From Swiss-Prot:
Catalyzes a trans-dehydration via an enolate intermediate. GO terms for biological process: amino acid biosynthetic process; aromatic amino acid family biosynthetic process; chorismate biosynthetic process; quinate catabolic process. This is 3-dehydroquinate dehydratase. It comes from Blochmanniella pennsylvanica (strain BPEN). It catalyses: 3-dehydroquinate = 3-dehydroshikimate + H2O. NCBIfam families: aroQ (TIGR01088), PRK05395.1-1 (NF003804), PRK05395.1-2 (NF003805), PRK05395.1-3 (NF003806), PRK05395.1-4 (NF003807). The lineage of its organism: Bacteria, Pseudomonadati, Pseudomonadota, Gammaproteobacteria, Enterobacterales. It holds the Pfam family DHquinase_II. The record marks R21 as: Transition state stabilizer. InterPro entries: DHquinase_II, DHquinase_II_CS, DHquinase_II_sf. Homododecamer. It is an enzyme of class 4 (lyase). GO terms for molecular function: 3-dehydroquinate dehydratase activity. Belongs to the type-II 3-dehydroquinase family.
Length: 152
């Protein structure tokens, strides 16, 4: 029997404007195109991927809560909520699902208020500064992590 991993991709505030908002920082590709490419990659890896984007913190929290028992792994770009949301952190601690934090830009070379993340210390890993390729890297790492976990 082949296991199909269930990975949830979550994108936070303003990422719906990817390709429009400060493209010199975040890139020129629309979120819909990024997600479409990730769906193709996930299919090639035998992964069932779902995607959710919201500008509202409470909707992201609800999405994380609903992932309990429905997702094996989460990839999240929390965007600005990275630096402000204790509630997102608590949501992850509540469901106990491994996750990778992704940022399109390198948050450590930008404004000082972006240096701190409320999620990094509880994430399996953090990928930042590689644009949309960071999502692909996270997807491959999630697959590798889940494959190792299932083979133990």
């Amino acid at each position: 029997m082949v296991n199909t991993f269930r990975i949830l991709l979550i994108n936070g505030p303003n990422l719906n404007l990817l390709g429009i908002r400060e493209p010199h920082i975040y890139g020129y590709e629309a979120l819909s195109d990024v997600v479409a490419n990730l769906y193709k990659t996930s299919e090639s890896l035998g992964i069932h991927m779902d995607h959710f984007q919201s500008n509202a913190e409470h909707e992201l929290i609800e999405c994380i809560h609903k992932s309990y028992k429905n997702s094996d792994f989460i990839i999240i770009n929390p965007a600005a909520f990275t630096h402000t949301s204790i509630a997102l952190r608590d949501a992850f601690l509540s469901v106990n699902i491994a996750f990778i934090e992704v940022h399109l830009s390198n948050i450590h070379i930008r404004e000082k208020f972006r240096y701190h993340s409320y999620l990094s210390d509880i994430a399996l890993g953090v990928i930042c500064g590689f644009g949309v390729y960071g999502y692909h890297c996270a997807l491959h790492m999630a697959h590798k992590y889940l494959s190792k976990k299932i083979n133990k």
